[in-house]
Amino acid sequence: MSIIKKIVFKRFNSTLKKTALHDLHVSLGGTMVPYAGYSMPVLYKGQTHIESHNWTRTNAGLFDVSHMLQSKLSGPHSVKFLQRVTPTDFNALPVGSGTLSVLLNPQGGVVDDTIITKENDDNEFYIVTNAGCAERDTEFFHDELQNGSTLDCQWKIIEGRSLLALQGPKAKDVLEPLLSKTAPGKDLKELFFGQRHEFALKDGSLVQIARGGYTGEDGFEISIANEKAVEFAEQLLANPVMKPIGLAARDSLRLEAGMCLYGHELDESITPVEAALNWVISKSRRDLVDQKYWFNGYAKIMDQLNNKTYSKVRVGFKYLKKGPAARNGVKIFLPDAETEVGLVTSGSASPTLNNINIGQAYVQKGYHKKGTKLLVQVRNKFYPIELAKMPLVPTHYYKQ
């Protein structure tokens, strides 16, 4: 049975935006739903949710992620700006490398999670943020730049470009034949996880390719001009190991990989420490005496990190018995079925783990250790779960 039936979307709105691939999705039998202000495919005709999920894990899947906000930060003080609004050390980031980070409000809460890549030695950074946060992120960047009016840097949205994600163990085999062998640029075997470089297609068109993604598999995210996006997608899909994949599988894939979804695992009330994202807080930025080098929410975040003053932590879990999946907002209890100790943020059956139910949650400090057995309450019944280390399935990133 397809588990897509468990996913609920808002009523379709005729004012939704469309990506450059919208008509292609429809022609491929995509079931279009509203998502983050866009009309996006959740499934494709002839593929169940589980089939799409498993295909990506074993072959290659094409995801349209053009709804994501692509932007650029430039100027002599770009690094200083990033050092204030994120806890990550961008002084140490090599050219052509990117990293996951978080945008922080003054209280240390997560405004959005983001991938930020250093494009060159001229302090230019490529930034990808969530579509559902686009309006708030735009206000955030503008407000923070005004607050730092002495900083010489500019932020602007990149217009006219699509973003395609190729994910799965055979993604490289599909992409490589479409790239020019004569134009200057790195070979894909020299592009490692987290890196992004410019490549040329066989027709001479330039694309920016980053190695990574949102599934836990090896893969690529390709920024390409809108007018070239459909032709490029069709060329990718001409390979029989590549199939179009929708939002349903994208969500279950990221859940297995232990990745956050903004609005579920992350929001402005959650700090990176509570979200178990300590690794985005660079060690070089943890013991700063001079406050002029502090990032937003520094005092609170460092207190949580050093003194464990947080009250809850993001965790992964697996069901110990069959039952309905625990969705966002489901309560978590101690084995006595009386003491509430947490809330589920995301949950689904896991196709990779023989469809056992898995999820992520926030659990009170002291009950958050791997192996802890708790209960979730679904439809007035209790089901036993065990907290598990994330990712919940092995990842296969292409690293040096």
UniProtKB/Swiss-Prot annotation:
InterPro entries: GCS_T (IPR006223), GCST_C (IPR013977), GCV_T_N (IPR006222), GcvT/YgfZ/DmdA (IPR028896), GcvT/YgfZ_C (IPR029043), TrmE/GcvT_dom1 (IPR027266). It catalyses: N(6)-[(R)-S(8)-aminomethyldihydrolipoyl]-L-lysyl-[protein] + (6S)-5,6,7,8-tetrahydrofolate = N(6)-[(R)-dihydrolipoyl]-L-lysyl-[protein] + (6R)-5,10-methylene-5,6,7,8-tetrahydrofolate + NH4(+). One of its GO terms (molecular function) is aminomethyltransferase activity. Keywords: Aminotransferase, Mitochondrion, Transferase, Transit peptide. Substrate binds at residues 221, 250, 397. GO terms for cellular component: glycine cleavage complex; mitochondrion. GO terms for biological process: glycine catabolic process; glycine metabolic process; one-carbon metabolic process. It is found in: Mitochondrion. Its EC number is 2.1.2.10. Pfam families: GCV_T, GCV_T_C. The keyword rRNA-binding does not apply. NCBIfam families: gcvT, PRK00389.1. The glycine cleavage system (glycine decarboxylase complex) catalyzes the degradation of glycine. Present with 4090 molecules/cell in log phase SD medium. Belongs to the GcvT family. Component of the glycine decarboxylase complex (GDC), which is composed of four proteins: P, T, L and H. This is Aminomethyltransferase, mitochondrial. It comes from Saccharomyces cerevisiae (strain ATCC 204508 / S288c) (Baker's yeast). The lineage of its organism: Eukaryota, Fungi, Dikarya, Ascomycota, Saccharomycotina.
